């Protein structure tokens, strides 16, 4: 039912009127592309733009100011082409980062890190006689080989059965006879940290889908990973640059309903006013998109409703006790296991932002921790956030393959859930959604 006051968006010329709902990377990229030849109105329910591009202005006790990212942190020059193009057009400056990961297990006392050479892998002499750990290192190589072998099987190959192509990570590991030690101390920490999911959920990820991501990012070899970078001054720099190109930015303006009318779309915002647009891009999480559609189709229910998200409580703080005790084992990403057989409900990972963003060494480290709320000293907490991340199951991956069925010439969907859930996936989906409703990035 269309109720409320109707209003048209003021045009600056004869340009089309286009709205983008949601200002994460997908919405910002769509808005940037569409702003080339359209008047764009950007709706954002929050008090700030950016979504996971979330930069905090921090002042230390000596009065020094730092910009610390807590959501989107790193990108690389190999697998982020859409985001890099956006940065280039905006004049965004980036800098090289330190990409490494550690695992610390409270149960057996294990601490090690990858990406830092031998001193990280063997931070203490005792690991040289730790049979389980040394066997795990050999299993890593075997895992890389078997994962690449699965990817090399054509999906229509007669040698490939539905069970091998559709198997979960947990099934893949069991069939490959990988040890529980390897699963607990290498595999689930890797997946859980990368996708911000709990370890049990990590084992339910579709193996082939997961391995395609790892291979794409050079993570199915001991070496060969791309060079990772961060935005100088924080990711807020690109957010501000995009915002300057948009005709109208509406913060604190949740969208309550989206109505489709053939060759136009109406939006009812928080003030109950109806506004008509030539086209709309919905760049929210899928469940939010489904909620604001006034007349969702059966297909939209099936597809958008099949994509779960995890909710992660996140803290920006200075409590270094969440990092490994051994300085040689400390890394940029630091995964914590309460016990060797632990399957915590939430991911427990800490990002050393001083290392990742190459902040000045002042004797105080700025850390972002997902999960582990009770582990962090209250007087060290600077800010608290909640982020949501897409989760991947055989069902959600199947639904993802149908997303293109939902788009039309006047309404398209965007979000990192169209891909692997990362900033490049969001940017690429924003570009494609903008093009679907008539935008051109030239």
Where do the language-model regions lie?
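Extreme N-terminal leader/targeting segments of oxidoreductases
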Residues: 1-18, 36-37, 58, 393, ...
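Mobile amphipathic helical/loop "lid" adjacent to a hydrophobic cofactor/ligand pocket
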Residues: 77-204, 211
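Conserved flavin/dinucleotide-binding core of flavoenzymes
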Residues: 57, 113-116, 344-442
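N-terminal glycine-rich dinucleotide-binding loop that anchors FAD/FMN and/or NAD(P) in oxidoreductases
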Residues: 56-83
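Glycine-rich FAD pyrophosphate-binding loop
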Residues: 35-59
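Mid-domain catalytic core of redox enzymes
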Residues: 256-390
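Helical element adjacent to the flavin cofactor pocket in flavoenzyme catalytic cores
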Residues: 212-270, 275
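N-terminal Rossmann-like FAD-binding beta1-loop-alpha1 element of flavoenzymes
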Residues: 16-42
């Amino acid at each position: 039912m269309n109720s409320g006051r109707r209003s048209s968006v003021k045009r600056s010329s004869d340009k089309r009127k286009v709205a983008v709902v949601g200002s994460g990377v997908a919405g910002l990229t769509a808005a940037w592309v569409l702003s080339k030849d359209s008047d764009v109105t950007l709706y954002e329910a929050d008090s700030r733009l950016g979504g996971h591009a979330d930069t905090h202005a921090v002042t230390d006790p000596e009065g020094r100011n730092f910009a610390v990212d807590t959501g989107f942190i790193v990108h690389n020059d190999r697998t982020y082409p859409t985001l890099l193009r956006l940065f280039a057009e905006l004049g965004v400056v980036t800098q090289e980062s330190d990409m490494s990961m550690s695992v610390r297990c409270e149960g057996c006392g294990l601490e090690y890190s990858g990406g830092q050479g031998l001193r990280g892998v063997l931070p203490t002499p005792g690991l040289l006689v730790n049979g389980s750990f040394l066997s795990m290192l050999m299993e890593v190589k075997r895992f890389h080989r078997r994962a690449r072998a699965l990817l090399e099987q054509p999906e229509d190959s007669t040698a490939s059965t539905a069970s091998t192509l559709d198997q979960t990570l947990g099934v893949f590991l069991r069939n490959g006879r990988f040890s529980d030690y390897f699963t607990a101390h290498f595999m689930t920490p890797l997946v859980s940290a990368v996708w911000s999911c709990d370890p049990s959920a990590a084992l339910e990820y579709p193996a082939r889908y997961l391995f395609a991501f790892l291979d794409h990012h050079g993570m199915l070899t001991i070496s060969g990973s791309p060079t990772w970078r961060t935005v100088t001054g924080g990711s807020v720099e690109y957010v501000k640059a995009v915002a300057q190109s948009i005709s109208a930015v509406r913060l604190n303006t949740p969208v309550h309903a989206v109505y489709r009318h053939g060759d136009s779309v109406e939006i009812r915002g928080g003030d109950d006013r109806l506004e008509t647009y030539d086209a709309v891009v919905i760049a929210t999480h899928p469940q939010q998109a489904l909620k604001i559609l006034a007349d969702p189709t059966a297909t939209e229910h099936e597809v958008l409703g099949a994509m779960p998200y995890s909710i992660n409580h996140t803290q920006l703080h200075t409590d270094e006790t969440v990092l490994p005790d051994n300085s040689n084992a400390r890394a940029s990403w630091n995964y914590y296991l309460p016990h060797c057989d632990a399957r915590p409900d939430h991911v427990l990972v800490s990002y050393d932002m001083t290392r990742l963003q190459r902040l000045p060494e002042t004797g105080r480290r700025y850390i972002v921790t997902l999960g582990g709320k009770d582990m962090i000293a209250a007087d060290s907490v600077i800010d608290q956030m909640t982020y949501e991340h897409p989760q991947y199951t055989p069902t959600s991956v199947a639904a993802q393959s149908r997303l293109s069925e939902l788009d039309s010439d006047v309404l398209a969907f965007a979000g990192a859930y169209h891909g692997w859930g990362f900033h490049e996936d969001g940017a690429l989906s924003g570009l494609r959604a903008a093009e679907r409703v008539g935008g051109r990035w030239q």
